[in-house]
Amino acid sequence: MTANLAARRWWMIMPIIFITYSLAYLDRANYGFAAAAGINQDLGISKGLSSLIGALFFLGYFFFQIPGAIYAERRSVKTLVFWSLVLWGACAALTGVVSNIPSLMAIRFLLGVVEAAVMPAMLIYISNWFTKRERSRANTFLILGNPVTVLWMSVVSGYLVHEFGWRHMFIAEGVPAILWAVCWWFLVQDKPAQANWLTAQEKRDLDAALAAEQAAIKPMRNYGEAFRSPAVIKLCAQYFCWSIGVYGFVLWLPSIVKNGSALGMVATGWLSALPYLAATIAMLAASWASDRLGSRRGFVWPFLLIGAAAFAASYALGSTHFWISYALLVVAGAAMYAPYGPFFAIVPELLPKNVAGGAMALINSMGALGSFVGSYFVGYLNGATGSPVASYAFMSAALVAAVILTLSVKPQARDAQTLGAPLQGKMHQ
């Protein structure tokens, strides 16, 4: 019965959340192709302002994470994500009809606002349906929407901007989110008890397994207590630094590739896709091994260290060896994405359910702030220096800081094996 239940949950839930998060990532990441395809010249945007506009999404994303997570935890993930889909699809499509810089800035900020709650809501949704031993893989299937989307989006966006221009690209890639909102509404149930495709016994078994996990976690009274815990504070700082590298890479990779290779937009799209193919493979391998070995932290920091080393090597090469630097960027992209599943499995194993969703939202909001910093400063450094070399050093340093912070997280003794922490003396939270 357990095997049948597990198989049914994977097939009924994972495709839905994968598609949903893929559409969210599509509408936030395609600005890099517009920047490479002439939006700056068409609207009279300077290089410095282009960096700010590209990063404004993450500023809106930062402010509305926690309110959205609280609503999802206490009320309904289904309702929250439905309206988010409709609104972000509309904002993304409207980007294609902007005629001036202020309207573009407003839409980029609003896009971040309406997408803000989706990631923490999805993580809460996964924690309602999957047990501790499954969560790293479940998180990975959610976050696979990132690299898989950028993989095909790089090719499709490159073609669209080449054939039709950046305006048609935004419109064509915004409409699917609105259409998918209808599918989401009819396919999703918030809790196992509401699912008509589970038997009564399967519902009881799943509820019992999830309740048993909660009984093993130290209780916390409220969000304030959770937010003040050393582990949450360190994970916030870690995700801030990690996201500097990830989104500095994601948003400006098309421009780096186009300028360095001197190829057209279609070829740029194909080259920009390859790091995300490598990232997809790395994420699947890391999440499977993390659940199999029961280790979380041990599948986070080594990959981030590899990413830092790849960026550092690109910095050392300078701007005269593009193809070697490009190969290192493929390595860096795979290494930065690989740890997502294990990382987001840490918090539900440290904190009780009544505060875990809010804590994940806080951590994700700090990641959004790091994404803003990475998006802005990588774009700024590329424009100010005329090459991506300085930004490689910046992203490498951020990932090294993330490695140090990951190693500093000390779980409770009973959670040490799960987090893969070395036991040296008495462990404490």
Q: What is the role of each PLM region?
A:
Residues R296-I346:
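C-terminal transmembrane helical hairpin of 12-TM major facilitator-type secondary transporters
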Residues I107-G145:
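Cytoplasmic helix-loop-helix junction between adjacent transmembrane helices
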Residues E73-L85, D291-L304:
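Cytoplasmic membrane-interface "Motif A"-like loop-to-helix N-cap segments
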Residues L142-A195:
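Helix-loop-helix hairpin linking two adjacent transmembrane segments in secondary transporters
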Residues F64-S76, M283-S295, N382:
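Helix-to-loop junctions at the C-terminal end of transmembrane segments
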Residues G44, S76, V97-S103, V114, ...:
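Helix-breaking motifs and short loop linkers at transmembrane-helix boundaries and internal kinks
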Residues F63-P102:
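Conserved MFS/SLC helix-loop-helix module at the cytosolic interface between two early adjacent transmembrane helices
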Residues G32-F33, S229-S287, Y340, F344, ...:
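Extracytoplasmic gate region of multi-pass secondary transporters
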